[in-house]
Structures are given as structure tokens and as C-alpha cells.
Amino acid sequence: MAGAELRAALEQRLAALAIRTEVVEHPEVFTVEEMMPHIQHLKGAHSKNLFLKDKKKKGYWLVTVLHDRQINLNDLAKQLGVGSGNLRFADEAAMLEKLKVGQGCATPLALFCDDGDVKFVLDSAFLEGGHEKVYFHPMTNAATMGLSPEDFLTFVKNTGHDPIILNFDKN
């Protein structure tokens, strides 16, 4: 499926769950820094997404944190019980295979494409921060989609993923 078809499939899935969204179209962006000028007016929690690989078990992890978080992969690996030094950024081919999105498009909204190979880690600040909306790319890095934290969790669980919720403020 191409990007437009994947986005339409995502929108259909969200509609089937009666999840309302707000979408802002913007130029294609590849980093949080490029994205923020286009969406900083949107009130809520903006995301940074890391697609990682566990070098020992060959497992995949999608880690979604607040956009301004700095993540130490060794500390994260210890928290996840995979051992320090065992998490690496996965290559684009793996992301395309597992989530059907490429570089700059990593998003938890792509979890509906995963067959259960990707573990999902979510920053607890998305759920505990009192945010009206949480924002992610809708299968394209030329748009940003907002939905309520409750609806987001409903969507994630509907994909068959039980998020590992971590408090990154403790690090």
C-alpha cells in the first residue's frame, strides 16, 4: 500500500472506533526540529518516535516520547530489560517491513500495520500530563494528527499492542 492508501486505511480504522481527530497538513519534515514551526500552535503533547532494534533477540521497539526528550539508549535498554548496549536504531527497511512507513514517518499510528513483532513503549507524560490532544504523523510526515489521549490508547490496544508505559522523568 502506498502512503495515501495507508493514511486512508488509518482514517477508516479510527472512524470505525468512533475516534475523532484533528489534522494539520504541512511540508514534509524529517525531524522534530523541522516539524515544530508548523505545529507549535497546536496545544497538547507532540511526539518524537524512535524505531529501535534489540541486537540480541532481534526484536523491534517503537518508543514514543515527548518531542523535547533526550533519550539515552543504554538507560532505556536497562529499563526494558534488554541489557545496556543492546538497543540500536533499526534501519529503514525494517521500519518499512514492520510499520509500512519510512524515514521521518515513525509513528504509533502505524501499529495497525504490525503483525505483533513490534513492542510499543509510551512516555507516561502523554497520559498523565493533562493534555487535551496528543499528536503523531498519520502515516505521512507531511501531516500531523491529534487525538485525545484516551482515544489514542483505545486505538493502540485495538491494534493488539499493550503499551509499556515508562516514566522518563525519573531518568
Swiss-Prot record:
Pfam families: tRNA_edit
Superkingdom of the source species: Eukaryota
InterPro entries per record: ProX/PRXD1, YbaK/aa-tRNA-synt-asso_dom_sf, YbaK/aa-tRNA-synth-assoc-dom
GO molecular function annotations of the record: aminoacyl-tRNA deacylase activity
Family membership noted in the UniProt record: Belongs to the PRORSD1 family.
Protein name as annotated: Prolyl-tRNA synthetase associated domain-containing protein 1
Taxon lineage: Eukaryota, Metazoa, Chordata, Craniata, Vertebrata
Gene designation per UniProt: PRORSD1
